[in-house]
Amino acid sequence: MNFEHNQKKPDNFHEDWKGQFKIFPWMAYISAIPHVIYIVTTLKEDGTPNAALEGWSSFTGESENFFVIMSGLIKTSHTYQNIKRNKEFCINFLSSDYLDNFKKSISENFDDIDEIKNSGFSSEQSLSINVPRIQESFLKLECEFEWEKELVPNSTNITLCGRVKYISADREFAMNKVTERFGKKSFVFHLMAMKNPYTGERISGGIGKIKLLKETEL
């Protein structure tokens, strides 16, 4: 029998950490929809590079217009404040070789440090914006701020859209066939922790990658 429920949080769903269900929707812990993760780089008010692990995003557009929509950006974060001030940011996709670097970008985000360097990455100059890119990234999207929207009035998070002004793709990644393009050296996915909907018990999450099932087109 399927688990069926309305939008009201189940009574047996208790927070694993303070503010959990203020920042994240409880349904996310049932749906467990995987999402690609990346490092977004921005510039702090004094021009020092900022780097932060992000996800909860989609990529869309038409013709010569390509956009990134970040839907879980915390309003109090350095990333959001920097984008609002400078109107620029860069999306940097990195492989699973850099999982430890990802963690460092979360745990060590002090105001007075170069977070790209501190996370173990190398900076390189972007070609359309002032924000630096991460050299180790196999796919970089240089973006300018387009718009933002609260999905819920007075929300903790903001949904933000950026227009991609310039793309930089690793030669091997860009030329590979689909059978070779996705794997250990490619996109990393966050498989978020879940909740047992019947007991409220926490189920551990993880990190994943794409496994090609069939070479075909839809």
Predicted regions and their residues:
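Basic, polyanion-binding surface patches
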Residues: 1-218
